[in-house]
Amino acid sequence: MQQGIPVELSPSKVQEHIAAGEKFCMIDVREPWEFQTAAIAGSNLVPMGSVPNRLQELEAQADQSPLLVICHHGVRSLNVVQWLRHQGLENCTSLIGGIDQWSRDIDATVPRY
């Protein structure tokens, strides 16, 4: 992905990047029960409350590929991305509309709740 990754990306833009062979490290910041209800294949659960304690881990992952931060509707993920950027981790973006929008636009097999 180019330098200057946007703060937010739409599901269709994420899909375009993936189709072009680009990789994301997908970080789901929802609660465990939400993750069990619906998840994007390949995403990793890092509940929002645990993000500060896992900052070094997230920085290491962001060195490998951009972090795509996911939540239910895109609010928590945007807050996490803004916090990460404030900590100096710029290689991250929030999924606009969250997993709900992903289910509607990209993969209808992901349950909506």
Regions found by a protein language model. Name each.
Residues 70:
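Short, surface-exposed ligand- or partner-binding patches at beta-edge/loop junctions that are enriched
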